[in-house]
Design a protein with these regions (language model features):
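General beta-strand structural signal in soluble alpha/beta enzymes
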Residues: 186-191, 209, 282, 305-306, ...
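Short alpha-helical segments and helix-capping/turn motifs at coil-helix boundaries
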Residues: 171-176, 192-195, 288-291, 354-361
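Active-site/ligand-binding-proximal alpha/beta "capping" segment
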Residues: 347-375, 379
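Catalytic or ion-translocation cores adjacent to nucleophile or general acid/base/metal-coordination motifs
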Residues: 237-260, 264, 271, 276-279, ...
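N-terminal ligand-binding/catalytic initiation module
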Residues: 5-254, 260-267, 271-272
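Structural alpha-beta junctions
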Residues: 180-185, 300-301, 367
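A generic secondary-structure micro-motif detector
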Residues: 164, 282-283
């Protein structure tokens, strides 16, 4: 029987229509499969093959990764993926995984994505034999929460490639092991792959993690793309693969201090004054760069931030990092002038290119007092 192919809207574009914050039900009741949330976590890989899932366009998806594998390497990538499953499923999963590899550039195993909502639940809702293991599960769910993660269904939290796991099988196995482990065990995870539970003691770490550890001679961009496509390494960024992402809040203080010091150095603002009446132009409203907007408001400035990704801009606005969001340059210019004249502390988001914004400022004879950029460009070749 032919399964429905995974398809995208157009080439590589996605519908970003989604309410970022939605009502969550903290439940331990039954899901579609008749299992409770706790039972799902305890079961790990399901005993029956779940139905194939098409790509869900209610969330943003990772861009297609480069095709870097030879035909023999593609076979190896599929073999690496099939090791998580019983042999009776291999004839069904092998062509499906090949399709994901050729269409998406990586095997994510979308079929095994859970039906339950993923978000950081109250800790007592997690099945566990020790509080620290439940805490790790909570942290993983925070990293994969669709209102937080950049590409949640590809298990990427931020930075374009900051992965929690390489595929959904690894997630399911990790949840099962964490649900069952005790304080005399340690879970070892290598680039998303749960190696297993090992005897330890209560004073040892509950989880030992490594991500992307390779020797320098084999650490080029191409080496990474190849090993990632094979399913043998991942880039965890700083806090994605270590399960502790907190978004912009971790850098707001440093960004605020940097902005204040720039004004003191270049605009000769004294140490007792805020940045009232100062116009600060920058770009980037990604997972971390939302800190710029909040820092500008804390410092008392008027900030205009350009962001080409409408989904990222909307998310930062709805989360409260950004004061206002505009799609029209004319309205941005009018609002900025008004805010500067009134000495407001406000961040004004513009969905568009920073070059267009700068050109509009020139055309309207507006000279920014300070300029910066935080478009990190983690995936410059995608």
């Amino acid at each position: 029987r032919k399964e429905k192919h995974l398809t995208r809207n157009g080439n590589s574009s996605y519908s970003f229509r989604r309410k970022i914050f939605f009502d969550r039900v903290h439940y331990s009741g039954e899901t579609k499969m008749g299992l409770t949330f706790k039972q799902h976590l305890l079961n790990g890989i399901p005993s029956e093959l779940p139905p194939l899932k098409p790509l869900d366009n209610s969330v943003p998806h990772a861009p297609t990764r480069p095709q870097v594998l030879s035909e023999s390497e593609k076979k190896l990538a599929i073999q690496n993926s099939l090791r998580y499953f019983p042999a009776k499923w291999h004839s069904t999963l092998a062509p499906e995984f090949l399709q994901e590899l050729e269409e998406l550039g990586h095997i994510y195993m979308h079929r095994f994505r859970p039906d339950y909502d993923i978000f950081a639940r109250p800790i007592h809702e997690y099945p566990s034999n020790c509080l620290s293991a439940a805490s790790v599960m909570l942290m993983i769910h925070n990293n994969l929460d669709p209102s937080i993660a950049q590409f949640p269904h590809e298990l990427i939290t931020y930075g374009g490639n900051g992965s929690v796991f390489q595929n959904w099988a690894q997630y399911l196995i990790a949840m099962e092991l964490l649900s069952k482990m005790n304080e005399s065990q340690t879970l070892v995870v290598n680039s998303g792959h749960p190696l297993g539970l090992f005897p330890s003691n209560p004073d040892s770490p509950r989880v030992v993690i490594s991500n992307g550890l390779v020797i320098p001679n084999y650490s080029s961009q191409l080496d990474y793309e190849r090993m990632n496509a094979l399913g043998v390494t991942q880039f965890g960024q700083m806090t994605a693969g270590s399960y502790m992402y907190i978004g912009p809040q971790g850098i707001v203080h440093g960004t605020t201090i940097t902005l204040l010091n720039a004004a003191r150095k270049y605009l000769e603002i004294n140490n007792e004054s805020n940045l009232s009446g100062i116009l600060f132009i920058t770009s980037g409203l990604g997972g971390m760069s939302g800190a710029q907007a909040k820092a500008a408001v804390i410092a008392g400035a008027v900030c205009i931030i350009a962001e080409v990704d409408s989904h990222a801009a909307v998310k930062r606005h709805q989360q409260g990092w950004l004061s206002e969001l505009h799609y029209d340059l004319h309205s941005v210019i009018l609002r900025a002038r008004e805010a500067v004249n009134n000495g407001e502390a406000v961040s004004i988001g513009y969905v568009g290119n920073i070059v267009d914004l700068l050109e509009a400022l020139i055309e309207n004879n507006i000279t920014p007092d300070l300029g910066s950029d935080q478009t990190s460009l983690h995936n410059p070749w995608l």
